[in-house]
Amino acid sequence: WERAPLLKGKTILVTGSASGIGLETARLCTAMGAKVLGVDVTKRFDHVEEFYRADLTDGATIDALIDVLPKGIDGIANIAGLPPTAPADKVLAVNLFGLKHLTLGLLPKLNDGASIVNLASLAGFGWSDAIPAILASEGVHVDDATRFAAEHQITNAGGRSYFFSKEALIAWTMQNRWTWRDRG
């Protein structure tokens, strides 16, 4: 990275930091001068300053993560995600419900002016066609992903669990884009 370190002195939390887009995001943030707090269910990645192992399908694990993470976070990069080949309830838990649980729990630990980036996909482009299920998903706890998937017949057929997780994430992100703006 040849530019000035744009993130120098910033603390960025990156979920999914051990592989794929999360790994590359952590590397880029580190190269840009950030202190990276990596979160993943698997292994530690060398380009993070601190690593936290957490399973984003489990509410108690997420709560424990929130408890141990430091205050003073300048950004959250919600990158962790499962593909449509994973069980539908796990896809919903990681890609949507766990992400929301973690993000909302971390709000008191964010610095004023902090940024939140939620990685979605073109798979979520049809979110407006899924509004009834999206509205039904609003208060669902991460530990209730299996029940929600069954009640709303969200399965892996045609990648539906993945598509829905991204549709609902886009809607939630748009819904909350102004929610915390008074913090800068």
What residue spans do the PLM features occupy?
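NAD(P)H cofactor-binding loop motif with strongest signal on the N-terminal glycine-rich segment
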Residues: 10, 17, 168
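Rossmann-fold scaffold of SDR-type NAD(P)-dependent oxidoreductases
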Residues: 15-16, 73-81, 113-121
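N-terminal Rossmann NAD(P)H-binding glycine-rich loop of SDR-like oxidoreductase domains
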Residues: 18-27
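Conserved glycine-rich Rossmann-like NAD(P)H-binding loop of the short-chain dehydrogenase/reductase
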Residues: 31-46
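Rossmann-fold cofactor-recognition segment
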Residues: 46-60
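Catalytic loop of short-chain dehydrogenase/reductase
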Residues: 83-84, 89, 115-184
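Hydrophobic positions on the long internal alpha-helix
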Residues: 102-110, 172-173
